[in-house]
Amino acid sequence: MTDLKPFLAKAASREPLTREEARSAFDILMSGQATPSQIGGFLMALRVRGETVDEIVGAVASMRSKMLTVEAPADAIDIVGTGGDASGTYNISTLAALIVAGAGVPVAKHGNRALSSKSGAADNLAALGVKLDVGPEIISRCIAEAGVGFMFAQMHHSAMRHVGPSRVELGTRTIFNLLGPLSNPAGVRRQLLGVFSPQWLVPLAEVMRDLGSECVWVVHGDGLDEITTTGITKVAALEDGKIRTFELSPADFGVSPCVLADIKGGDGVANAAALREVLGGAKNAYRDVSLANAAASLVIAGKVETIHDGMTLAAQSLDSGATALALDKLIAVSNDID
């Protein structure tokens, strides 16, 4: 089918789409066969009614079928957030990814430029000197040689160009805010996945289970799409096909609570400077919150069994210079410098 109208009519009637219907609808959206008005109407019908697990699974299946893929080790992990929390923090997942790579776990990081903040992962890494517009072979080399590779979302999801203008005109969150982090081009099966609202914790864990993930922690920390050290982080953890929920506090990571202002960042250049300070030995709230996210990621990766052990290994990665070396190698390989 190449006509969105039947799916639009069903969504507008507040009826849920089946997984297969959702995939067909998103195939139409992302192949340029729907008008801007149809795209906007369909996305808002889903948003107002509330997207279902089956609809998200179908939409992700469509996105994954069209993306430019990257080869990565089977045990690679991604640390990624949906964005949309409007918090303007430092690039926590970026530093956490480098720490995890320095600890010996391959990272296939997926990200984009900022949408609701001043600096997304892509802005931060570009300011650090990482080349973004590279092909799958170079990214695979980055993962193999640096322990971490960055997949710039717009390079891997070209079909999104068909819905981009409608999303901009709508000016509000749509299902696509959720789909990017669920569509990792390296097909990772282990993730630390931050979400902008706690309402999505369990539903996205269910989505990842249905899509075949092995271990995923979906987290929301005190308004952030990260594990936070400002207060309580809520977690829905997918492990061995089962989902459990729990909470984490700064004390669980052995760090002192901070306030949001302590981890507020700036643009890509400012955040790059802050990241370099931590690599240089600065002991501050940015270091603490990044270590916390890295520690959880090391548990998810199966590298350690406890958060405590994860914090120990993450701190070793940072303090030994292994994290800085991972960044240096990522910059060199992405720029194809021998």
Curated annotation (Swiss-Prot):
<dbReference type="InterPro" id="IPR017459">
    <property type="entry name" value="Glycosyl_Trfase_fam3_N_dom"/>
</dbReference>
<keyword id="KW-0057">Aromatic amino acid biosynthesis</keyword>
<feature type="binding site">
    <location>
        <begin position="91"/>
        <end position="94"/>
    </location>
    <ligand>
        <name>5-phospho-alpha-D-ribose 1-diphosphate</name>
    </ligand>
</feature>
<dbReference type="GO" id="GO:0004048">
    <property type="term" value="F:anthranilate phosphoribosyltransferase activity"/>
</dbReference>
<dbReference type="InterPro" id="IPR005940">
    <property type="entry name" value="Anthranilate_Pribosyl_Tfrase"/>
</dbReference>
<dbReference type="InterPro" id="IPR000312">
    <property type="entry name" value="Glycosyl_Trfase_fam3"/>
</dbReference>
<protein>
    <recommendedName>
        <fullName>Anthranilate phosphoribosyltransferase</fullName>
        <ecNumber>2.4.2.18</ecNumber>
    </recommendedName>
</protein>
<feature type="binding site">
    <location>
        <position position="226"/>
    </location>
    <ligand>
        <name>Mg(2+) 2</name>
    </ligand>
</feature>
<dbReference type="Pfam" id="PF02885">
    <property type="entry name" value="Glycos_trans_3N"/>
</dbReference>
<comment type="similarity">
    <text>Belongs to the anthranilate phosphoribosyltransferase family.</text>
</comment>
<keyword id="KW-0808">Transferase</keyword>
<dbReference type="Pfam" id="PF00591">
    <property type="entry name" value="Glycos_transf_3"/>
</dbReference>
<keyword id="KW-0028">Amino-acid biosynthesis</keyword>
<feature type="binding site">
    <location>
        <begin position="109"/>
        <end position="117"/>
    </location>
    <ligand>
        <name>5-phospho-alpha-D-ribose 1-diphosphate</name>
    </ligand>
</feature>
<keyword id="KW-0460">Magnesium</keyword>
<dbReference type="InterPro" id="IPR035902">
    <property type="entry name" value="Nuc_phospho_transferase"/>
</dbReference>
<feature type="binding site">
    <location>
        <begin position="84"/>
        <end position="85"/>
    </location>
    <ligand>
        <name>5-phospho-alpha-D-ribose 1-diphosphate</name>
    </ligand>
</feature>
<dbReference type="InterPro" id="IPR036320">
    <property type="entry name" value="Glycosyl_Trfase_fam3_N_dom_sf"/>
</dbReference>
<comment type="subunit">
    <text>Homodimer.</text>
</comment>
<feature type="binding site">
    <location>
        <position position="81"/>
    </location>
    <ligand>
        <name>anthranilate 1</name>
    </ligand>
</feature>
<feature type="binding site">
    <location>
        <position position="167"/>
    </location>
    <ligand>
        <name>anthranilate 2</name>
    </ligand>
</feature>
<dbReference type="GO" id="GO:0005829">
    <property type="term" value="C:cytosol"/>
</dbReference>
<feature type="binding site">
    <location>
        <position position="121"/>
    </location>
    <ligand>
        <name>5-phospho-alpha-D-ribose 1-diphosphate</name>
    </ligand>
</feature>
<keyword id="KW-0328">Glycosyltransferase</keyword>
<keyword id="KW-0479">Metal-binding</keyword>
<dbReference type="GO" id="GO:0000287">
    <property type="term" value="F:magnesium ion binding"/>
</dbReference>
<feature type="binding site">
    <location>
        <position position="93"/>
    </location>
    <ligand>
        <name>Mg(2+) 1</name>
    </ligand>
</feature>
<feature type="binding site">
    <location>
        <position position="81"/>
    </location>
    <ligand>
        <name>5-phospho-alpha-D-ribose 1-diphosphate</name>
    </ligand>
</feature>
<feature type="binding site">
    <location>
        <position position="225"/>
    </location>
    <ligand>
        <name>Mg(2+) 2</name>
    </ligand>
</feature>
<dbReference type="GO" id="GO:0000162">
    <property type="term" value="P:L-tryptophan biosynthetic process"/>
</dbReference>
<feature type="binding site">
    <location>
        <position position="112"/>
    </location>
    <ligand>
        <name>anthranilate 1</name>
    </ligand>
</feature>
<feature type="binding site">
    <location>
        <position position="226"/>
    </location>
    <ligand>
        <name>Mg(2+) 1</name>
    </ligand>
</feature>
<feature type="binding site">
    <location>
        <position position="89"/>
    </location>
    <ligand>
        <name>5-phospho-alpha-D-ribose 1-diphosphate</name>
    </ligand>
</feature>
<comment type="function">
    <text>Catalyzes the transfer of the phosphoribosyl group of 5-phosphorylribose-1-pyrophosphate (PRPP) to anthranilate to yield N-(5'-phosphoribosyl)-anthranilate (PRA).</text>
</comment>
<keyword id="KW-0822">Tryptophan biosynthesis</keyword>
<comment type="pathway">
    <text>Amino-acid biosynthesis; L-tryptophan biosynthesis; L-tryptophan from chorismate: step 2/5.</text>
</comment>
